[in-house]
Amino acid sequence: MYQNGKPDAPTILGQKRELEDVEIQDDDIQEVSKEDLLKDVRVRSIQFDELESKIEGLQNLAEEKLKVLATLVSWWPEILQQFSVVFQGNELKDFESEGVFSILEKFPELSYFNDAVKNNKTKALSIIQKLLSTVDSSTNSVSRDPFSVLSIDDSALTEKLNTINLDIDKILDELDTTRSQLHSIIKLPDRSSSFTLQCINESVRPQSTKVKEEATTSSKGKDEEKKVSTVEQRTQLQQLSRLQDQQNGLMESRSQSLKILDSNVNEMDKLIMERENALNNVETTNLKKYSSFLALKEAVSMTSEQLRVLEHLLSECSHEINVLSQQSKNFNGVFESSYQPLINDLDHQISVMQNDEKRINNAKTELSLSLEKKLEAKKQKEKVYKDKLDELANLETMVLEKKKAVATREAANKIRLVDLNDLELQKDLSTYLSKELASTEKAFRLVKQQTVKSSHSHYQELITKFSVEKEKAEQKYFLTMKSTDSLHAEVKLLRQKYQKTNEIISKMLNSQDTAVHRIIEFEDQLARLSSVRNNSIKQSTTFQVKKSSQKSTIQNLEEKVSYLQQFMDKNNATLTDLEFQCSDLSSSIDILSKQDEEHEKEKRKLKDTGVSTSAEELKTFRAMCKCSVCNFERWKDRIISLCGHGFCYQCIQKRIETRQRRCPICGRGFGASDVIPIHL
């Protein structure tokens, strides 16, 4: 808050803002017109007084009703005992005697009730009858009390009166609080603006040298003389603004209290209107209930007719159900006699067909296995035949090679053989070899022909066997297929017939189920209609009972209407008193208007003298709040904490960057950490 025993920058700024707020309030006071305020005060004071008188009348009325109710509650057992003693064993004709009402005179607290009953004896007799019925009945005496309607309405009135009283207490508390606030505001000490000016001057004024301080002290005397006059003018303006604030607060509190009272009075008016509407609606409700009673009679007649129709439908449905049950029994007998053997034959044929199919499948598997074996044997023989052909080809190549070798040897022998013996030997050998070759060729060819013939004959035998077996299998297959087709056709026909029979049976069962459901529904409808009939009879009886009871309520409401008319007459009398009060208030308002005119004259004088000085001070304050280094272009937003002098951010930043870190006013050195930001 304070640095070196002097105020900190935020405190100075707060003081400046307080000064600006005071000036704005002064301008608002000058713009307000007193005539409008006086008009509002007059109107609202009149409304407030009217509502206060209305509330007092309502409170008195409520107190009277509560007294009557309290007396009735406290004395009703003794009253009932007296009535029961007087009227025991008497008929209704004796009730019309005037001696009956003498009982009420025994109780002085029931004078109000006695006056109300004397005007209409039939109503009193009905009330007495109901009281006697409550004495005789053992249970539910409170619900049959003839004064229940009145007690309910009075309870509602008491609740609303309590709420109105609470609202009035709240308004009075608010008025007390506003008065206490006004007294506290008036007693508060007025802080003059000279203190704030001193704080600002101290924050702006150089504090380094003693010479400058002495120069400022000499100028202080002159400034203080000027400021004393301005302070006196400002105190007067503040007093005027406070007076106007007090008036505004009082007016607002008055307006709020008047609004609350208006709402409460409107609620009471609504209650009265609702009571009057209730009287008008009773007859309409009776007419509506009579029409509903006629509608109930028509409904009962309609239900009786519907019961007859339903009984007729039940008889028809029972007849149809009997016919359907007989048809279903006949159908079951025909089905068992005609279709059952056919189904058994079909089952037998299907089993035979399944066995034949199994045999055919087994034969097919055996034939396929035998054919596979024969094909494998044929392949093996073909392999053996190919091997033998390869051996023959190899032998032929060997023979050709031997012949070539013999030819070469013979040529060599012809050239080289010298001796004849050798030649003869060679010739003998060649002839022998040629003979052996021819015999071997013949033998080989014979073996080859025999093997080919044997293999060919065996192959043809196998083919003939396979063709014969194939023809037999095909004949069997075609026969089985024909038999299966015929059996399938028969099975299809039988299945179609069976489906048709199932559909007929399902339809019969569905129709039987629907008939049963319809019978159940008709029985439920009969039970409902019987319950509706019983309820309608009960409603008709209750309606008659209510009709008889509502007659008494209508009579009570008529009494209330007469009472409300008396209440309105009393309110009209109170209006005359309020008019006299209004005349007194108008005279007081004239006196206040004269006082307001005098205040306005003083206000104008203060305005003429105080505006010029305040404008000059504003200029000086603005000059003080601007930076002197940059020729008052920017606002001061930084302060050097060592000396307390303020400058703009740009000027101090330039000095820090250029290392000229001395205050331009006092020349004291500072660092970057000594600079403190402020907000003006």
UniProtKB/Swiss-Prot annotation:
<comment type="similarity">
    <text>Belongs to the BRE1 family.</text>
</comment>
<feature type="coiled-coil region">
    <location>
        <begin position="353"/>
        <end position="399"/>
    </location>
</feature>
<dbReference type="InterPro" id="IPR001841">
    <property type="entry name" value="Znf_RING"/>
</dbReference>
<keyword id="KW-0479">Metal-binding</keyword>
<comment type="pathway">
    <text>Protein modification; protein ubiquitination.</text>
</comment>
<dbReference type="GO" id="GO:0007535">
    <property type="term" value="P:donor selection"/>
</dbReference>
<comment type="subunit">
    <text>Component of the histone H2B ubiquitin ligase complex (HULC) composed of at least brl1, brl2, rhp6 and shf1.</text>
</comment>
<dbReference type="GO" id="GO:0033503">
    <property type="term" value="C:HULC complex"/>
</dbReference>
<feature type="coiled-coil region">
    <location>
        <begin position="485"/>
        <end position="609"/>
    </location>
</feature>
<dbReference type="GO" id="GO:0005634">
    <property type="term" value="C:nucleus"/>
</dbReference>
<dbReference type="GO" id="GO:0016567">
    <property type="term" value="P:protein ubiquitination"/>
</dbReference>
<dbReference type="GO" id="GO:0140673">
    <property type="term" value="P:transcription elongation-coupled chromatin remodeling"/>
</dbReference>
<keyword id="KW-0833">Ubl conjugation pathway</keyword>
<keyword id="KW-0539">Nucleus</keyword>
<dbReference type="GO" id="GO:0061630">
    <property type="term" value="F:ubiquitin protein ligase activity"/>
</dbReference>
<keyword id="KW-0175">Coiled coil</keyword>
<feature type="compositionally biased region" description="Basic and acidic residues">
    <location>
        <begin position="210"/>
        <end position="229"/>
    </location>
</feature>
<comment type="function">
    <text>E3 ubiquitin-protein ligase which belongs to the histone H2B ubiquitin ligase complex (HULC) which mediates monoubiquitination of histone H2B to form H2BK123ub1. H2BK123ub1 gives a specific tag for epigenetic transcriptional activation and is also a prerequisite for H3K4me and H3K79me formation.</text>
</comment>
<dbReference type="InterPro" id="IPR013083">
    <property type="entry name" value="Znf_RING/FYVE/PHD"/>
</dbReference>
<keyword id="KW-0156">Chromatin regulator</keyword>
<dbReference type="InterPro" id="IPR013956">
    <property type="entry name" value="E3_ubiquit_lig_Bre1"/>
</dbReference>
<feature type="coiled-coil region">
    <location>
        <begin position="44"/>
        <end position="72"/>
    </location>
</feature>
<keyword id="KW-0808">Transferase</keyword>
<protein>
    <recommendedName>
        <fullName>E3 ubiquitin-protein ligase brl2</fullName>
        <ecNumber>2.3.2.27</ecNumber>
    </recommendedName>
</protein>
<dbReference type="Pfam" id="PF08647">
    <property type="entry name" value="BRE1"/>
</dbReference>
<dbReference type="GO" id="GO:0008270">
    <property type="term" value="F:zinc ion binding"/>
</dbReference>
<dbReference type="GO" id="GO:0140850">
    <property type="term" value="F:histone H2B C-terminal K residue ubiquitin ligase activity"/>
</dbReference>
<feature type="zinc finger region" description="RING-type">
    <location>
        <begin position="627"/>
        <end position="667"/>
    </location>
</feature>
<dbReference type="Pfam" id="PF13923">
    <property type="entry name" value="zf-C3HC4_2"/>
</dbReference>
<dbReference type="GO" id="GO:0040029">
    <property type="term" value="P:epigenetic regulation of gene expression"/>
</dbReference>
<dbReference type="InterPro" id="IPR017907">
    <property type="entry name" value="Znf_RING_CS"/>
</dbReference>
<keyword id="KW-0863">Zinc-finger</keyword>
<feature type="region of interest" description="Disordered">
    <location>
        <begin position="206"/>
        <end position="233"/>
    </location>
</feature>
<feature type="coiled-coil region">
    <location>
        <begin position="261"/>
        <end position="288"/>
    </location>
</feature>
<keyword id="KW-0862">Zinc</keyword>
